[in-house]
């Protein structure tokens, strides 16, 4: 087993090395300029996300689709991942993470656009879409579409299911002393109540859970920043200067280089917002929307909230806390966020614990739909119920077993998902540009599209 784990670890490191980072970041930059900087319409996207398009075709509201995508995206990576990036790459990693989110918005925009453009209406009236449908219907590459679906289904049992259940069980054990098997049963029952209801039930829960957990976490960050008010601006200066001159950080960050700051900041940003991975457009295709561009704008806001807001807030909290409290150092590594939140009297540690628990549970819900849509593409609706039950059972086993090998396999599957998705994005970028010109730059966002 150790040999297999080592092999997947090597494969994961290779797949998520500089070639993948350059490919993803290059796609972000290419689409930003190919689509004429759609980030300029951020406020329009935010407005559309909270404005129901009830008469349009689709299964869930645009906000429901966004909330479900955010449920799967906003996870422990926003908390632990940023801390790891700062510990390994220095304060400058925060700026690189933030910039990755800014440019990643264009990729998430293109993913949402193509998802709606090539979605299909099943016999039961439900909408299905995502990279697999764009690859098949837009590029006639069904073989690559099937590969994407297989990688997505496998990834759903890893990063979306067992890994999250394990995080919840271990945290509940460490914090409250609860047996992992008992926590596993509870998570299974709670998840079953939502997942067995399908996308409408998942979206309904996510529209309540996601805003609540995100606002609560951000408020916690704001409290810490108020406590560290004298160090906030110095932290901003340190983040900016050390991104290009790590020696400016001094102290324990002296070992960091510009390459390390960029490497860990960019990688964490890419992991965090999933722009380019191809997962979020699966639920974007289910949105009630009049045309592809409306949902594309809404989808792009997901990267803004996840990386530009939440990851940036986490980074600012960490760096300002290191400056404010001499007992907090980069050596705390992944525990940096926990140490920083512990400075809030009485409620700091419980608040962070609750945040991690809800982030992990919401990821379970979002990824269950991604995996179900993938197996539905391969085998049809007859396997949906079986997949849901298998996913719920896997949650229990995830809570009680060692998951080192699962982490490495999940990382590999996520990288392998990205490759077919990036092929679709780059080869169909001309279509995305045409649709953007037709609806967005011609001010025709209220026009209806023709759907098959």
Predicted region positions:
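Flexible loop linkers connecting adjacent transmembrane helices
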Residues: 37-61, 84-86, 90-94, 98, ...
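Membrane-interface loop-to-helix entry segments
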Residues: 23-30, 34-47, 166-172, 179-240, ...
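Selective recognition of specific alpha-helical transmembrane segments in multi-pass small-molecule
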Residues: 103-111, 185-199, 210-230, 263, ...
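N-terminal alpha-helical transmembrane segments of multi-pass membrane transport
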Residues: 1-76, 86-93, 104, 396, ...
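Transmembrane helix-loop junctions in multi-pass membrane proteins
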Residues: 3-4, 34-39, 77-82, 158-169, ...
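Extracellular/periplasmic helix-exit of transmembrane alpha-helices
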Residues: 32, 111-118, 222-238, 246, ...
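Helix-loop-helix module between adjacent transmembrane segments
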Residues: 27, 31-32, 100-125, 131-195, ...
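Alpha-helical membrane segments and immediately flanking helix-loop junctions
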Residues: 56-88, 114-132, 136-137, 150-153, ...
């Amino acid at each position: 087993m150790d040999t297999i784990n080592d092999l997947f670890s090597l494969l994961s490191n290779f797949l998520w090395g500089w070639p993948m980072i350059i490919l993803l970041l290059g796609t972000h930059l290419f689409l930003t300029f190919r689509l004429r900087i759609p980030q300029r319409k951020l406020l329009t996207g935010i407005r559309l996300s909270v404005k129901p398009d009830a008469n349009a075709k689709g299964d869930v509201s645009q906000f429901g689709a966004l909330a479900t995508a955010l449920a799967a995206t906003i996870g422990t990576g926003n908390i632990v991942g940023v801390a790891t990036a700062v510990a390994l790459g220095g304060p400058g990693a925060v700026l690189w993470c933030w910039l990755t989110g800014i440019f990643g918005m264009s990729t998430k925009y293109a993913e949402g656009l193509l998802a709606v453009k090539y979605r299909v209406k099943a016999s039961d009236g439900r909408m299905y879409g995502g990279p697999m449908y764009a690859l098949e219907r837009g590029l006639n590459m069904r073989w690559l579409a099937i590969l994407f679906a297989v990688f997505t289904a496998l990834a759903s049992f890893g990063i979306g299911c067992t890994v999250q259940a394990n995080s919840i069980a271990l945290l509940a054990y460490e914090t409250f002393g609860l047996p992992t098997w008992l926590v596993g049963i509870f998570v299974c029952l709670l998840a079953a109540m939502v997942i067995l209801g399908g996308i409408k039930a998942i979206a309904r829960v996510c529209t309540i859970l996601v805003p609540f957990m995100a606002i609560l976490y951000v408020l916690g960050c704001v409290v810490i920043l108020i406590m560290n008010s004298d160090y906030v601006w110095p932290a901003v200066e340190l983040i900016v200067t050390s991104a290009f001159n790590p020696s400016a950080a001094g102290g324990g960050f002296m070992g960091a280089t510009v390459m390390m700051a960029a490497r860990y900041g960019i990688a964490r940003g890419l992991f965090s917002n999933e722009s380019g991975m191809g997962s979020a457009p699966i639920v974007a295709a289910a949105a009630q929307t009049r045309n592809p561009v409306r949902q594309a704008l809404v989808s792009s806001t997901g990267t803004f909230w996840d990386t530009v807001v939440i990851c940036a807030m986490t980074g600012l909290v960490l760096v300002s806390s290191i400056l404010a409290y001499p007992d907090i150092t980069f050596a705390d590594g992944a525990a940096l966020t926990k140490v920083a939140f512990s400075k809030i009297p009485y409620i700091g540690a419980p608040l962070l614990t609750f945040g991690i628990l809800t982030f992990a549970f919401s990821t379970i819900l979002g990824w269950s739909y991604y995996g179900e849509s993938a197996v539905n593409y391969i085998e049809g609706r007859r396997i949906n119920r079986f997949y849901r039950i298998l996913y719920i059972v896997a949650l229990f086993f995830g809570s009680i077993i060692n998951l080192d090998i699962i982490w490495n396999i999940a990382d590999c599957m996520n990288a392998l998902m990205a490759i077919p998705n990036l092929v679709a994005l780059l080869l169909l970028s001309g279509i995305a540009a045409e649709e953007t010109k037709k609806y967005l730059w011609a001010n025709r966002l209220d026009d209806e599209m023709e759907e098959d």
